[in-house]
Amino acid sequence: MKRRFLALVLAGCLAAVLSTAAWATETPTSVSTEMELTTALGDTAVTSIQLKGNIDISNTLVVTKDVTLDLNGFVLKITGSGSVIKIESGTLTLVDSNPSAEHKFTNDGNDKPWRLDETAGAEKVKGGVITGGTGNTYKYNNDIGQIVYNDCGGGVFVAPGASFIMEGGNIVGCSAGKSGGGVKVTNDGDFKMSGGTISGCTAGGGGGIDNRGTTTLSDNAKIKSCSATGTGRDDHGGGVCSYRNLTVSGSMVISGCTAQNNKSYAMYVTTGYPDARSSIEGGTFDGSVWLDHSSSGKITVSGGTFKNGASGVWTVTFNTNGGTPEPESQIRANLPATKPDDPTRSGYVFVGWYTDEACTAAYDFTKPVTDSVTLYAKWEAAPRYYYNSGTTTDTDNADEDKKGSPKTFDPGAGIYAVSVALSLTGTAWIGRKRH
């Protein structure tokens, strides 16, 4: 009995210790000054940081570990030049525990980044904010030499091998002369955005995001009112400019963005790298989209709402020729269309979907869609069977047969139609016309 009691006491103590340790680990380190924030980022024991007030920083914050930063509704602003945050290694997760806090910005127009103006700003932003970044030039060595990223990453710069996860908060009013006004993702960098907003940011290309690594946009991510101001060969994508691996899904939205290249106000996607693959599975794009298929088959589309059209995205439309229901059109690129449920039509049998109105060329649902197409339903008249309970002489009138008029017959002779029916015993019976 004593042993059992002692075991229970020890178990309780152990649970208390583990609970206390877990609580201590999960409690964020509170910061309200640049010094406190810089110190917390440099402390390897600190894995979670929470702002307790607005903080102005004079230099770029450098992340070299796995850490969560909670903006907590406050403003993190760089007063000097450079990126607000540079993720050198590890993973930075951005969250915001006070999304109802309100801040004001002024939109000066002419493709300029929004400016923090808490007194008279007309652009209202809900939640914590990262702002003021102007980008920088970064150099990295790899197996083939040195890579130079010029004047990029106004808000957050994601270095090769580093990761950025954005679940909440806002990146607003950041800029870069070359690329990635809001976020710059470098070769082998990784960016996942499932929440929060990137807005009022500008760059030569990729006003909101410039991706040369792997970027995933999903759920409630929003990119709005960003602009690509450059006119060079690589200056595309007011909202997003992607050259490598991009996945877009869920209810994410890109809206109100502009670009000097008017084909890509919302987004520009190409796959210039040999291993690059991009997939558009959802999202809403309120602005022109340009998918550059010069690298054949590397960009696929299976969903999404393209409000202002999209170059490189094709539509499969269905014409049921009187049948119901009418299937919804499908957005596709380099993927097969999904065969809809067969429509129905009174008095007819559905044969299949065809690419021409005359219904002579059947459509192959296993082949990838590489152009817009309208598919037509083909119908054949359903066979008719007649039954007459009386005994009538069949005149075998050939003209009547051609018109398809019903035949009467002796009920003892069976059905007048060459058909086969299986009895419950599996025996085949053939109905014949009586002579």
Regions found by a protein language model. Give the residues of each.
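Sec-dependent signal peptide cleavage junction
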Residues: 18-28, 404-411
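Acidic Gly/Asp/Thr-rich repetitive segments characteristic of extracellular carbohydrate-active
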Residues: 25-52
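Right-handed parallel beta-helix
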Residues: 71-74, 91-132, 140, 144-145, ...
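C-terminal low-complexity, Ser/Thr- and acidic/Pro-rich disordered "stalk" regions positioned immediately N-terminal
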Residues: 378-408
